[in-house]
UniProtKB/Swiss-Prot annotation:
Extracellular compartment residues: 22-84, 129-132, 242-312, 421-422, 471-836
Keyword Transmembrane (UniProt): yes
SUPFAM superfamilies the UniProt entry points to: TPR-like (SSF48452)
Protein family: Belongs to the TMTC family.
Name of the gene: TMTC2
Keyword RNA-binding: no
Membrane-spanning intervals of the chain: 1-21, 85-105, 108-128, 133-153, 163-184, 185-204, 221-241, 313-333, 400-420, 423-443, 450-470
Any one GO cellular component localisation term in the record: endoplasmic reticulum
Coiled-coil intervals, chain numbering: none
Repeat region (TPR), residues: 493-526, 527-560, 561-594, 606-639, 643-676, 677-710, 711-744, 745-778, 779-812
Protein name, UniProt field: Protein O-mannosyl-transferase TMTC2
Places the protein is found: Membrane; Endoplasmic reticulum
GO terms, biological process: calcium ion homeostasis; protein O-linked mannosylation
């Protein structure tokens, strides 16, 4: 137990510095915005949605079905909300548990000695695990590994207890259930069944390739045949159920996720896909350069046979074949009690022996021997060591390295990444075993004590360096800014783009703009980056530039609904209503098939319809507005906040004098968000109109209480007081509103109106003057300023404002009438007029 405890403790200690880390990268979508984690969402939705909260059968789903992992996130959310500390704690504890189980598994293969320690410590400290442990979404890989090892250990028990029917099939059942759980943590967990079959055939029974078929059909090997058959049946059942549950359709990804898959050249696809496992192995061997994302151009495509990286591919597969040949073709030899050797159960005086760990350490004590139990029948004639030979361990290590990695090779279907470090969490078990057994074989082979010491210290140094790299890399996962800055050298386009989002959230606008432009320098057709840059420019009132980048974003991805939405909003605010209307309509017609995030798309489409309804509403087309609002309600996703939409429905019904319907929607708005201020104000107006004055006043006062800094609340309350002939109170509310929102034309203009109606003409003049300065080319503002100046006896200033208003709107009858009256007064007073 010491090796397990020490290895687990190291795995725990190395990741303690992640407990203070924030949510990073994929954590946002899988946790922070995932509706399946919320208490109001039925927990059963977890079993119908993918890892990101999208319906599994939806055409845009990633098909990543990991309900047990999502369930663990939901439990975290129920206990600690969105505090990242508890999420990181669970990840670290899971890694420590997996490390302990892996060390226990290694002990079965390597014995209780230094080499088991080495395997466990190497796994605990390997830097390739940082994404899986420090990144919260990596819990899927760590959880799958936990049940992967439990399944494998149960199967090993099943093999060793053959002949005891109840116990052996109990262990087999446990192995199958754990394999199913591993798959429900992450898809590659199901591959443990294939690894178990490799263990049974090549390690427990020590068969070679040419012996499998002749041996497996022998009557005495019926239990082996039955076990392998059940493994195949259970694996096929799990895969069949998995395919059925996701709608029998493979996932679809954008070309930037996996550029090789999108290449038209068969040669490019072939060379690149053959090279990628080589690159993954290099990350295991030398995890010096790590990145949060390896998509896009992080690994350039191999387009010709002359690409020097093809040499790496050749070397990799040559080495792999040689290792496989060594493990599968070499005779497997065991030492008998009498000192002779046994090859696959037959005596062989010339074979080599399989030494135990104790013998490797030059001890005189031999490993314990057990009576051979093979194929369910005890064999007391020949005995063998408990430890498998080096060849057997090489075969099992290769199976652990290769088989769990196969789903990520694009062999059966294209995947949505080029390289994913967290996918290597399970294969790294095979890698650690392979390195350990190689070091052990070398240690046994050399004779000089100096060389043995050198091997010992070299492996210890490797573990130390791995641990240091892990601790340093964990620092990059502390927050998104550090993470994205660390990835610039590997994937500059993605890293700069994501860094821009972080800098923008920190209000570092110029730095964010620079980051977005850097991202577009490396990859100019990234729709998300074009959109994000457009949004940044829009928020800083650079509308012409924003429209340009929105247009480029739509050109790059015609289904990007959010770009249409913001384009329409800018056009509407610029008075280009027909262009805005067409833009909103086009957005509303975009289907959500094959989209990466259908929930976000539906939210944008709903917002487009909401703004289209507002456009119709402002134009006085209330029936058309209602029709659009109803369509928006039908299309809105469950995470969409509907209070503004419901409130506008009420407004439209009120304008159509359908007061009961209006009241219904105002109440719906307040039900969906009890502190929604616009609904308090509009519902208050309706109550005042229908004679429920005290209820109306309560709503106005509640709105002010909710946000005492919002001038519009005082404005509505002031209008109510004015209608109630409470003129002094109304005037106070008007002044308060104008002071709070002195840059908002509507508030200032309406405040001036109210003060004028309250006969406070001097105060009214002040705010009419401010309104005219806010909109110097708005005829109504100039006309009303002229009128109040007229009343206050400032006749020449009044004339100037009337004339300016008529320049902007020559046919305005009221202004013309007021000007004529003004001239009459001025002539009576002997003042010079522009007419004369």
């Amino acid at each position: 137990m010491i090796a397990e405890l020490v290895s687990s403790a190291l795995g725990l200690a190395l990741y303690l510095n992640t407990l203070s880390a924030d949510f990073c990268y994929d954590d946002s979508r899988a946790i922070k915005t995932n509706q399946d984690l919320l208490p109001e969402t039925p927990w059963t939705h977890i079993f119908y949605n993918d890892f990101w909260g999208t319906l599994l059968t939806h055409s845009g789903s990633h098909k990543s079905y990991r309900p047990l992992c999502t369930l663990s996130f939901r439990l975290n959310h129920a206990i600690g909300g969105l505090n990242p500390w508890s999420y990181h704690l669970v990840n670290v504890l899971l890694h420590a548990a997996v490390t302990g189980l892996f060390t226990s598994f290694s002990k079965i293969l390597l014995g209780d000695g230094y080499w088991t320690f080495m395997a466990g410590l190497m796994f605990a400290s390997h830097p390739i695990h940082t994404e899986a442990v420090a990144g919260i979404v990596g819990r899927a890989d760590v959880g799958a590994s936990l049940f992967f090892l439990l399944s494998l250990l149960c199967y090993i028990k099943h093999c060793s207890t053959r002949g005891y029917s109840a116990r052996t099939w109990g262990w087999f059942l446990g192995s199958g259930l754990c394999a199913g759980c591993s798959m429900l943590w992450k898809e590659q967990g199901v591959t443990v069944l294939a690894v178990s079959a490799v263990y049974d055939v090549f390690v427990f029974h020590r068969l070679k390739i040419k012996q499998i078929l002749p041996t497996i059909y022998k009557r005495k090997n019926l239990s082996l045949f039955l076990s392998i058959s059940l493994l195949i049946f259970w694996g096929s059942s799990l895969l069949g159920a998995r395919l059925y549950w996701m709608g029998n359709k493979p996932p679809s990804f954008s070309n930037s996720d996996n550029p090789a898959a999108d290449s038209d050249s068969l040669l490019t696809r072939t060379l690149t896909f053959f090279y990628l496992p080589t690159k993954n192995l290099w990350l295991l061997l030398c995890p010096d350069t790590l990145s949060f994302d390896w998509s896009m151009d992080a690994v350039p495509l191999l387009k010709t046979v002359c690409d020097w990286r093809n040499l790496h591919t050749v070397a990799f597969y040559t080495g792999l074949l040689l290792l496989a040949y060594y493990g599968l073709k070499s005779p497997s030899v065991d030492r008998e009690c009498n000192g002779k050797t046994v090859t696959n159960g037959k005596q062989n005086a010339n074979g080599h022996s399989c030494l135990s760990d104790v013998e490797y350490q030059n001890s005189e004590t031999k490993s314990s021997f057990a009576s051979k139990v093979e194929n369910g029948i005890k064999n007391d004639v020949s005995q063998r060591t408990q430890l498998p030979s080096t060849e057997n361990i090489v075969v099992l290590s290769l199976s652990l390295l290769i088989i769990p990695f196969v789903p990520a090779t694009n062999l059966f279907f294209y995947v949505g990444f080029v390289i994913a470090e967290r996918v290597l969490y399970i294969p790294s078990m095979g890698f650690c075993l392979l390195i350990t057994v190689g070091a052990r074989a070398l240690y046994v082979k050399v004779q000089k004590r100096f060389l043995k010491s050198l091997i010992f210290y070299a492996t210890a140094t490797l573990i130390v360096f791995y641990g240091l790299k892990t601790a340093i890399r964990n620092g990059d996962w502390q927050n998104e800014e550090m993470l994205y800055r660390s990835g610039i050298k590997v994937n500059p386009a993605k890293a700069w783009g994501n860094l821009g989002n972080v800098l923008k959230s920190q209000s570092k606008i110029s730095e964010a703009e620079s980051a977005y432009r850097n991202a577009l320098y490396y990859r100019s057709n990234m729709a998300d980056m074009l959109y994000n840059l457009g949004l940044l420019l829009q928020e800083n009132s650079r509308f012409a530039e924003a429209l340009h980048y929105y247009k480029l974003a739509i050109g790059s991805r015609p289904t990007l609904a959010s770009a249409y939405l913001n384009t329409g909003i800018i056009l509407m605010n610029q008075g280009r209503t027909e262009e805005a209307r067409r833009t909103f309509l086009k957005c509303s017609e975009i289907p959500d098939e094959n989209l990466k995030d259908p929930h976000a798309h539906k939210s944008s489409v709903t917002s487009c319809l909401y703004n289209l309804g507002k456009l119709y509403h402002e134009q006085g087309h209330y029936e058309e507005a209602l029709s659009v609002y109803k369509e928006a309600i039908q299309k809105m996703p469950r995470q969409f906040a509907p209070q503004s939409l419901y409130n506008m429905m009420g407004e439209a019904y009120m304008r159509l004098s359908k007061l009961p319907e209006a009241e219904h929607w105002y109440m719906e708005s307040l039900r969906s968000k009890t502190d929604h201020i616009p609904a308090h104000l509009t519902y208050g107006k309706l109550l005042a109109l229908t004679g429920r004055k005290s209820e109306a006043e309560k709503l106005f006062l509640k709105a002010i209480e909710l946000d005492p800094t919002k001038g519009n609340c005082y404005m509505h309350y002031g209008q109510f007081l004015l209608e109630e002939a409470r003129l002094i109170e109304a005037a106070e509310m008007a002044k308060k509103a104008a002071e709070l929102d002195s840059t908002e034309f509507d508030v200032v203009f309406n405040a001036a109106h109210m003060l004028r109606q309250a006969s406070l003409n001097e105060a009214a003049e002040k705010y009419y003057d401010l309104a005219a300065r806010l909109r110097p080319n708005y005829p109504a503002a100039l006309m009303n300023l002229g009128a109040i100046l007229h009343l206050n006896g400032r006749l020449q200033k009044a004339e100037a404002n009337y004339l300016r208003a008529l320049q902007l709107k020559p046919d305005d009858v009221i202004t013309q009438s007021n000007l004529r009256k003004l001239w009459n007064i001025m002539e009576k007073q002997g003042l010079k007029t522009s007419k004369t």
